[in-house]
């Protein structure tokens, strides 16, 4: 390992000492849209909105998938950051992050064309969250608090995706 590498590793460790609590707050607040969509579906309404149907009404399944793609995009960006600011970055991270987001985007477009694709989109998004976590675990240089939070959030998001899939089953209705 060169002196440049050891200095870089030291800055990685040093940065982890300053874990910003906003990460925790924003991370858990980010679960709310997933939970809202599940609650609307669980209630049997299958649409957001308290106004008459003349106004914009959002399908909670489509809302769930679009929000999922947005969050996957944010998380995939962390692999890009590692490429430039961490000694653990590699080209595989760039390719993997792009593949996850593009796959999720294709699933979203397919869902918007025909809702018959929505279960596939929810499944691929769930797998995307798990793949990103697995890849991030190999290169994660941040502190234990962040790692625990990241694992918990990914578990909860994957669980919510599974619940969405269960709610989509014909027997659930």
Q: Which positions does each model-derived feature cover?
A:
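Selected alpha-helical membrane-embedding segments in polytopic membrane proteins
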Residues: 2-83
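Transmembrane alpha-helical segments of integral membrane proteins
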Residues: 3, 126-142
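Helix-adjacent hinge/juxtasegments
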Residues: 79-108
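Cytoplasmic-side transmembrane-helix entry/capping segments in multi-pass membrane proteins
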Residues: 88-98, 123, 146-155
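Transmembrane helix-loop-helix
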Residues: 108-131
């Amino acid at each position: 390992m060169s002196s440049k590498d050891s200095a870089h590793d030291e800055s990685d460790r040093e940065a982890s000492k300053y874990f910003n609590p906003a990460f925790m707050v924003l991370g858990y607040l980010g679960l709310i849209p997933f939970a809202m969509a599940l609650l609307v579906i669980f209630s049997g309404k299958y649409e957001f909105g308290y106004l008459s149907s003349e106004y914009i009404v959002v399908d909670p399944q489509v809302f769930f998938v679009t929000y999922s793609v947005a969050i996957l995009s944010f998380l995939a960006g962390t692999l890009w950051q590692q490429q430039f600011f961490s000694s653990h970055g590699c080209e595989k991270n760039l390719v993997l992050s792009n593949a996850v987001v593009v796959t999720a985007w294709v699933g979203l477009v397919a869902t918007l064309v025909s809702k018959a694709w929505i279960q596939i989109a929810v499944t691929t998004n769930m797998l995307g969250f798990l793949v990103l976590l697995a890849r991030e675990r190999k290169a994660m240089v941040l502190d234990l608090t962040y790692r625990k939070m990241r694992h918990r959030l990914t578990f909860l998001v994957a669980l919510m995706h599974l619940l969405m899939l269960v709610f989509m089953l014909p027997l659930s209705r």
